[in-house]
Curated annotation (Swiss-Prot):
InterPro entries, per the entry: Thiopep_bacteriocin_prcur
2,3-didehydroalanine (Ser) PTM positions: S58, S71, S72
Function according to Swiss-Prot or TrEMBL: Has bacteriocidal activity. Inhibits bacterial protein biosynthesis by acting on the elongation factor Tu (EF-Tu).
Propeptide residue span(s): 1-55
Cross-linked residues, Thiazole-4-carboxylic acid (Ser-Cys): S60-C61, S69-C70
Organism: Streptomyces azureus
Entry comment on modification after translation: Maturation of thiazole and oxazole containing antibiotics involves the enzymatic condensation of a Cys, Ser or Thr with the alpha-carbonyl of the preceding amino acid to form a thioether or ether bond, then dehydration to form a double bond with the alpha-amino nitrogen. Thiazoline or oxazoline ring are dehydrogenated to form thiazole or oxazole rings. Maturation of pyridinyl containing antibiotics involves the cross-linking of a Ser and a Cys-Ser pair usually separated by 7 or 8 residues along the peptide chain. The Ser residues are dehydrated to didehydroalanines, then bonded between their beta carbons. The alpha carbonyl of the Cys condenses with alpha carbon of the first Ser to form a pyridinyl ring. The ring may be multiply dehydrogenated to form a pyridine ring with loss of the amino nitrogen of the first Ser.
GO cellular component: extracellular region
Family in the record: Belongs to the thiocillin family.
Residues joined by cross-link 5-amino-piperideine-2,5-dicarboxylic acid (Ser-Cys) (with S-69): S60-C68
Location in the cell: Secreted
Gene coding for it: tpdA
Protein name, entry field: Thiostrepton
Record location of the 5-amino-piperideine-2,5-dicarboxylic acid (Ser-Ser) (with C-68) cross-link: S60-S69
Covalent cross-link (4S)-thiazoline-4-carboxylic acid (Thr-Cys), where: T63-C64
Length: 72
């Protein structure tokens, strides 16, 4: 599975979990240290190897999204 496929899979699962866009206002008071990748990844859909790769990709994507959103 390549990085693009991993990111697309993460995006679909993340959007299904969140279900809505939150603006910068929604990030006020957000404790980024308390965020868990497992909150956004349905681990039952992945095998062991896919899960490891996806969680690593998710961590980097989540960090980027949070950083970009918070710095706006």
């Amino acid at each position: 599975m390549d990085a693009t496929a991993i990111h697309e899979r993460w995006s679909v699962m993340s959007n299904a979990s969140i279900g809505q866009e939150i603006g910068v206002e929604g990030l006020t008071g957000l404790d980024v240290d308390a965020l868990e990748i497992s909150d956004y990844v349905d681990e039952t859909l992945l095998d062991g190897e896919d899960l490891t790769v996806t969680m690593i990709a998710s961590a980097s994507c989540t960090t980027c999204i949070c950083t970009c959103s918070c710095s706006s």
